[in-house]
Amino acid sequence: MSCQIEITGLVKRFGDNTVLDGIDLCLEPGERVAIIGPSGTGKSTLLRCLNWLDTPDQGTIRMGDVTVDAARATKAQILGLRRRTGFVFQNYALFANKTARGNITEGLTTVRGWPADKARARADDILAQIGLADRGDSYPAAMSGGQQQRVGIGRAMALDADLMLFDEPTSALDPEWVGEVLDLIRRIADGRQTMLIVTHEMQFAREIADRVVFMEGGRIVEQGPPAQIFGNPRDDRTQAFLRRVG
């Protein structure tokens, strides 16, 4: 196994509550990994630690040639991680005072340091790819939830990141917009983008993932191909969870 992304011994605490309790995970280049499990079990926190939105207490994260130890992380190393990740938030997290185009160019100019004209050209290309070529000048308030989340995904796509992180990308959407967002994620996955997806959409996880990880209590309980996890889970906790979600 050749790890493009390697997570070792990751621990995150909020006060006395240990949310991540020694996570070890490896992602191969182009691998699509879905994380499932009960609410409050640390799935979203894991993604946020990988982008240093939440600061882990222990453990190491390696992406390509950048390795960050939580105990001695430097600003340069953290920036190196962020430059290698694209994050799609469940609540869109768009800038209300920026257009669709402006939301996409923001990361290119601030994280990548691109000049404005180059960032604009990239944003227009991305808007075309996500089916919003005619909405570049629209503000979030004038767009549907599905359109806003597509802009959020486009913002992450624009960075050409080593790893795309999806934190329950459909949970805030009205049912009518879920399909279009899932279709866009499928298209990205078809390009063999390395992806880590937290989702409550079990059928989507079954379809898109090369590997499914079941988490509970801040730990990885079981992982394997979708056919195994959904068809023949080995751990009683995985079996119980899948029975509950139907």
Give residue ranges: language-model regions.
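Exposed loop/turn and edge beta-strand positions of beta-sandwich/beta-sheet ligand-binding modules
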Residues: 1
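ABC family nucleotide-binding domain
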Residues: 4-5, 11-226
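C-terminal boundary and immediately downstream tail of ABC-type ATPase nucleotide-binding domains
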Residues: 216-217, 223, 227-246
